[in-house]
Amino acid sequence: MNSKKVLGVTITAAALLIAVIQFIPAPALQIPAQLPAEQRDAHRLLNFEGISNFRDLGGYQTADGRRVKWGQLYRAGSFAEASRSDLDNLAALNLATLIDFRSSAEKEEEPNRLPEPANFTVIDIPVLDEGNRNLFAEISERIESDDFAEFDPNQIMEQANRQFADEFTPQFRQFIHAVEDANGQPVLWHCTAGKDRTGFAAAILLRILGVPQALVIQDYMASRQPALDARNRQVVMLRLFKGEETADKIS
């Protein structure tokens, strides 16, 4: 069997698998705020189907002995792959505000899937906007040309994290004001992976609320596995459509 036939069979099999998965009933969404107190920590990572790294920031103890309220502050990754079940389940969170940190390039590449009509306010606070546009263009060009010489995605993200602190104070100040303006109603913020920009925003907010630094770091680091899982899914799709060599250079 030649390579074109193998690729055709692989794509057909993947399409059939996706179609079958669409009809498998999703498990009921476990919302921590609606569970007994002793079960909430175990379900901090909400079991959405197509929204990665969706977490409730409730339950963290502050330095003065209080706790962050469950069901008020949520963080997540992209909604581009949200399932129909996910869109239905979002309503159960009674969100007042959704804050999107993604760049215009990211939103063009993978638009959010949200309930229609959305029963919450969407606020765009793009961080790394022009930088991300350039990065997306570079990655796309490298994938198409199969050229990954001297391309280090980890170095790019380290540089981005430094920029959060040095260059994006107005954006994160706007984020804090948006949370305040929600007047105690549930707020969700997200970027693409729900890790760096979203994590930086969560860290700022938790420190303002008085959560000790050790717990803030613990929450930030909790994004590593969900982000890795999401990246692995992207690599699988690259293997299907671009081949092993291209996928290995990204992974």
Predicted feature descriptions by range:
Residues 193, 197-198:
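Ser/Thr-glycine-rich phosphate-binding loops at phosphate-binding pockets of nucleotides
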Residues 2-188, 201-251:
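Cys-dependent protein tyrosine phosphatase-like superfamily
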